[in-house]
Amino acid sequence: MLAKRIIPCLDVTGGRVVKGVNFVELRDAGDPVEIAARYNDQGADELTFLDITATSDGRDLILHIIEAVASQVFIPLTVGGGVRTVDDVRRLLNAGADKTSFNSAAIANPQVIRDASRKYGAQCIVVAIDAKRRLATDVGRLDANGQAVGEGWDVYSHGGRKNTGLDAVIWARLMAELGAGEILLTSMDRDGTKAGFDLALTRAVSDAVSVPVIASGGVGTLDHLADGIQIGGADAVLAASIFHYGEFTVAQAKAHMAARGIPVRI
């Protein structure tokens, strides 16, 4: 069985790592280069770096920060936020990224996933999906294809600001079919709450696609990480708050997961 991965996440805006609750109420967590180096030393399996306001602000890629982070990190680095084109993938890979994450751009132009995957390989193309559970009042409305929707989760774009009307499970399946090598799945309802992953969402998407799924949004305890794997069916778990503010180390997280019978790289 393949080892399951623990991935600290650096949400960055204004050149600083931040963390919020439900995608708002951001507070400062430190310098991205220093934090990345710390996680590298702690034994993280990978790092994910997301410029969370690049798309909504219409900004270009912050390549100078990516280069600085990549110089300190010797584990796979995924970079997202403001990734719009196949050429952006080239620029990020040249800056030191190992994988690039598309979100809003894939919604605007799904073909970019196929094009990027064909040019650079599915192994370095991640599609990030920000999903939010539908309210009872949403059930029965028409989706983007004119079909009445049932219970489930909608996909949001532009840093969680815009409801696309797309169903998260169907969207994940389409992205995998077009060439995404991995799905980074974030529950907006759970983000920053420390209440645990939305395990129903994680399981629904994990069951729907054949590519690895990274569970994100809501980790507050080490058991939450293990639950994402064992109950949610995720291949990797991503967390921010519990690591950024020193509640737990990556090593503690791995030891706990190993004790729960989950294969990890120690």
Swiss-Prot record:
| Catalytic residues as annotated in Swiss-Prot or TrEMBL | 11, 130
- Record-listed E.C. numbers: 4.3.2.10
Instruction: Keywords in alphabetical order, please.
Output: Amino-acid biosynthesis, Cytoplasm, Histidine biosynthesis, Lyase
Q: So what does this thing catalyse?
A: 5-[(5-phospho-1-deoxy-D-ribulos-1-ylimino)methylamino]-1-(5-phospho-beta-D-ribosyl)imidazole-4-carboxamide + L-glutamine = D-erythro-1-(imidazol-4-yl)glycerol 3-phosphate + 5-amino-1-(5-phospho-beta-D-ribosyl)imidazole-4-carboxamide + L-glutamate + H(+)
Question: Where, subcellularly, is it found?
Answer: Cytoplasm
Q: What class of enzyme is it?
A: lyase
InterPro entries found in the cross-reference section: Aldolase_TIM, His_biosynth, HisF, IGPS_HisA/HisF, RibuloseP-bd_barrel
According to its UniProt entry, the protein's GO biological process terms are: L-histidine biosynthetic process
Q: In which pathway does it act?
A: Amino-acid biosynthesis; L-histidine biosynthesis; L-histidine from 5-phospho-alpha-D-ribose 1-diphosphate: step 5/9
Instruction: Give the main location.
Output: cytoplasm
| GO molecular function annotation | imidazoleglycerol-phosphate synthase activity; lyase activity
GO CC entries? cytoplasm
Q: Does the keyword Phosphoprotein apply?
A: no
The record, for SUPFAM superfamilies, names: Ribulose-phoshate binding barrel
Family in the record: Belongs to the HisA/HisF family.
Sum up the protein's function in the record's words. IGPS catalyzes the conversion of PRFAR and glutamine to IGP, AICAR and glutamate. The HisF subunit catalyzes the cyclization activity that produces IGP and AICAR from PRFAR using the ammonia provided by the HisH subunit.
- Describe the subunit structure: Heterodimer of HisH and HisF.
In Swiss-Prot or TrEMBL terms, this protein is called Imidazole glycerol phosphate synthase subunit HisF
